[in-house]
């Protein structure tokens, strides 16, 4: 089984963290928690409203607080927001308290998946593609820095991605529990 207290899903928006995370949590008997949803419940406002009323910096504070509290627990599958890894403290906490799965998705696939999504404050601009490329350039090395396992999700359905992760996680966890 997972040698870490939690399983943590990281990756850009549109990678499938929440959808695949729910499926994995059910498969492994973990409690699924979406950090963005936890923020909404704690603050009592939607993510777009938090960005509009208080700005991204305040949202990131809420995100760090929620992530810290969730990762203090065990037996959780924690689905992070795409920008959670921007904070060095978040990256450290994620590594310390979770086995980290990085779901990678290309910008063209993100554009397709997020075409009708109006709940992403950072994408409410006409230059969505440029914004996503900029985010990828900044964030991809940070995702790679903390990832224990990476899965490319561009051409996978949620069911296919989940099936691949179940096999890869089981193999990884077996290897980590085998005496040297």
Swiss-Prot record:
Q: Which residues bind substrate?
A: 36, 60, 82, 139
Which reaction equations make up its catalytic activity?
shikimate + ATP = 3-phosphoshikimate + ADP + H(+)
Keyword set, alphabetical order: Amino-acid biosynthesis, Aromatic amino acid biosynthesis, ATP-binding, Cytoplasm, Kinase, Magnesium, Metal-binding, Nucleotide-binding, Transferase
Report the EC code(s) recorded for this entry.
Answer: 2.7.1.71
**One Pfam annotation, family name?**
SKI
Q: Which domain of life is it from?
A: Bacteria
- Entry annotated with the keyword Nucleotide-binding: yes
Task: Write down the top EC class of this protein.
Answer: transferase
What biological-process terms (Gene Ontology) are attached?
Answer: amino acid biosynthetic process; aromatic amino acid family biosynthetic process; chorismate biosynthetic process
Q: Which InterPro entries match?
A: P-loop_NTPase, Shikimate/glucono_kinase, Shikimate_kinase/TSH1, Shikimate_kinase_CS
For activity, the cofactor(s) needed are: Mg(2+)
Task: Tell me the residue numbers annotated for binding Mg(2+).
Answer: 18
Q: Name one GO cellular component term.
A: cytosol
Give the record's cofactor note, including how many are bound: Binds 1 Mg(2+) ion per subunit.
- Any one Gene Ontology molecular-function term assigned to this protein's record: magnesium ion binding
Under which pathway is this protein filed? Metabolic intermediate biosynthesis; chorismate biosynthesis; chorismate from D-erythrose 4-phosphate and phosphoenolpyruvate: step 5/7
Q: Where does ATP bind?
A: 14-19, 120
Q: Which SUPFAM superfamilies match?
A: P-loop containing nucleoside triphosphate hydrolases (SSF52540)
Subunit structure as annotated in this protein's UniProt entry: Monomer.
User: Function, please?
Assistant: Catalyzes the specific phosphorylation of the 3-hydroxyl group of shikimic acid using ATP as a cosubstrate.
Q: Which family does it belong to?
A: Belongs to the shikimate kinase family.
- The protein depicted here goes by the name Shikimate kinase
Q: What is the originating organism of this protein?
A: Xanthomonas campestris pv. campestris (strain ATCC 33913 / DSM 3586 / NCPPB 528 / LMG 568 / P 25)
């Amino acid at each position: 089984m997972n040698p870490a207290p939690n399983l943590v899903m990281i990756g850009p928006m549109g990678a499938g963290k929440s959808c695949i995370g729910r499926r994995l949590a059910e498969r492994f008997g973990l409690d699924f928690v979406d950090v963005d949803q936890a923020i909404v419940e704690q603050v009592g406002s939607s993510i777009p409203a938090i960005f509009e009323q208080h700005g991204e910096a305040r949202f990131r504070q809420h995100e760090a607080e929620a992530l810290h509290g969730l990762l203090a627990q065990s037996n959780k599958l924690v689905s992070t927001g795409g920008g959670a890894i921007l904070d060095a403290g978040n990256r450290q906490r994620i590594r310390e308290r979770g086995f980290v799965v990085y779901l990678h998705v290309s910008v063209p696939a993100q554009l397709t998946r997020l075409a009708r999504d109006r709940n992403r404050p950072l994408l409410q601009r006409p230059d969505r593609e440029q914004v996503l490329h900029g985010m990828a350039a900044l964030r991809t090395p940070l995702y790679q820095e903390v990832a224990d396992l990476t899965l490319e999700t561009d051409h996978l359905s949620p069911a296919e991605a989940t099936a691949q992760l179940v096999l890869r996680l089981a193999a990884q966890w077996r290897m980590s529990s085998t005496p040297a």
